[in-house]
Amino acid sequence: MRITGEMGNLAAWEKRLFYMCSARPTLHPRALFSDVTSDYRNPAEPVPGDEVTIRLRTGRYNVDKAYLVVDNVEHVMTRVRSESMFDYYEAKINVGTDKIYYYFKVELGRTVCYYNQIGAIKDLNPYYNFQITPGFKTPEWAKGAVMYQIFVDRFYNGDKSNDVLDDEYNYIGEHVCQVKDWNKYPAQMGIREFYGGDLKGVLDKLDYLEELGIEVIYFNPLFVSPSNHKYDIQDYDYIDPHFGVIAHDEGEVLKEGDTDNTHATRYINRVTRKSNLEASNEFFAKVVQEIHARGMKVIIDGVFNHCGSFNKWLDKEHIYRDSTDEYAPGAFERYESPYHNFFKFYSNQWPDNNSYDGWWGHDTLPKLNYEGSKELEEYILSIGRKWVSAPYNVDGWRLDVAADLGYSPEYNHYFWKRFREEVKKANPDAIILAEHYGDSYEWLQGDEWDTIMNYDAFMEPVTWFLTGMEKHSDEARPDSYGNPDYFFGAMHHNMARMGGQSVAISMNELSNHDHSRFLTRTNRTVGRTNTLGPEAANNNVNKAVFKEAVVMQMTLPGAPTVYYGDEAGVCGFTDPDNRRTYPWGHEDTELIDFHRAAIKMHKENDVLRKGSYKSLYSAYNVVAYGRFTSDDAAIIIVNNNDDEVRARIPAWEVGLGFDDDVEQLLVTFEGGYSTDRLGYHLQNGWLDIGLRKTSAVVLHKMKW
């Protein structure tokens, strides 16, 4: 009250001076930034013995002190550079062999703020500290690389002589069949249906993939297997001749009503005869060689948690027993089999012991018993080496259900450590990429996997935000639809848990062989083919929303991965409907042209491949984020509303100056897209922009 009374007697200028002198300084937390790119950690992937420079960005003259806190010890940082809006602080640390955990602390007057992987925070949470793992290096070629996933049987039939024949063998109780109509939808129980796609078909379409802008081809399983998906491997040493070459083709198919595969002599000859197997391997080596000649890489699928009941080690169907080439007896038939300890049997009911352990109880997917067999462990490790070595020289492995391998967490981690050692020894630049749902932190510590299929920090948050749908189309959640807090919260949490090195090469897919096609998710319809029928997957889809998703795919951190046919407008509920054939001759050419333009933009702007990432703006159904480096910046804005909106974006947060200009690289909207260059002028570091309904726009720093 005394101050109030005295203030009443002061002149106006004296009051202003009083307030200026007594006001607390204001810290600008949105100006704080650091990450694990080379702009803020150099070297970004240090090895033991390196001196590492750690940087922190702050607002210009906006902090009194900045500290790098390493393992809870504060190190004063030095201001080394100033720009119009920012100061940059540095500290140097020496790296040994142990992991290093760090965060930042800044002080301004009595205000204290911390900064870690999820941004500026008031209270510490070591869960999100930055981490240095000495010696953890990820393949440079994979950072931001544009990948393309091919489910081979459904891509293109380039060689009809290797097609699966009607009644060629019996699979899960019924004869297999050859689908004569390429455009037929997969049947609900279509595991016995074969469309005829093969590696010759991929070879024939390499021009298309190259023109699309693809840099990496990821193949679903290629090894010998009785299914069309081939996640039940029969022989890890050979490419399936139905995908490769059948050099010698003789024998009989099954007669009607016959379910005994020992009578399936045509199949036995095709998949067990060494001349066919070796010819298929040779052809695959030529395919990889041609892909490499075009500057592209190859990733193959490794299914090492389980094999198939047809596998030569188990030989439940007795097809190897009757082969013209010599094979050891399978563990299903004889206790004395050299492969007996490759599986876990629960009884001694030989011959034909059906008590083996199946993955999740599936008798067609015998779980491999690594803990019981050193021979099995060494064999699979040799497979890991074989395919990344000459003459095949593939560029990495995608690991199916990798966290399930073995019977204990301890063995699982032990095996993947050995697998990494062996694969990297054979091909140091090979990528090890795992399928995983949930927190992958414990496997991404530099000695097991390089990265993962990015469900948690890409597919799921993008799907929930743009469609409100679960990734199988099994559930709709209105509370997640258009919810920017959920979107950015999920992104920041999961990216932090993965770590920047792994995020940069993670497989960012909108669709794949396990989930509904993203274009189908845009109809926001809960269902599957067995409840709604396949046509329902095509109804009321929204191409404008799909294009928004593709823009996000091409601009968020990671390796954008196109599932074959997505770019051509293929729809589908979850498997098997998501495995429809590529619609050659019936493509959505406008969508293909759009993908080509989006991929071109991604590849031509290095800031979109390797730049830092920062969230900038959020509102209902609207998000904006930036990608930036020390000398470049891009802003991406998505408006998923059915109405036009205006947004005011803090472009200064990604280093754009107060009077900079930005130009439009790509904009999508209902009915199309445009790559016309359109300029915008910033006002005091802010971008005021009108957004079309259901649109996405990519803006880039204009360079003069």
Show where each model-derived region lies:
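Active-site cleft segment of glycoside hydrolase catalytic domains centered on the general acid/base Glu
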Residues: P366-K374, V401-R420
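Conserved alpha/beta catalytic core and glycan-binding cleft of carbohydrate-active enzymes
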Residues: E140-A142, F310-L314, G384-R385, P391, ...
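Substrate-binding/active-site clefts of carbohydrate-active enzymes
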Residues: V152-E215, P221-P391, F419, K425, ...
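Loop/turn elements at helix/coil->beta-strand transitions in domains of secreted/extracellular proteins
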Residues: G144-A145, L212-I217, H292-I299, N393-W397, ...
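Short glycine/proline- and charge-enriched loop/turn segments
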Residues: D232-D240, I268, D363, T529-G533, ...
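Conserved, mostly hydrophobic/aromatic
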Residues: L56, I150, L209, F219, ...
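Active-site-proximal loop/turn and secondary-structure-junction residues that shape catalytic pockets
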Residues: F223, F304-G308, A403-L405, G438, ...
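Carbohydrate-interacting/catalytic domains
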Residues: M1-F151, N157, L165, K200-E215, ...
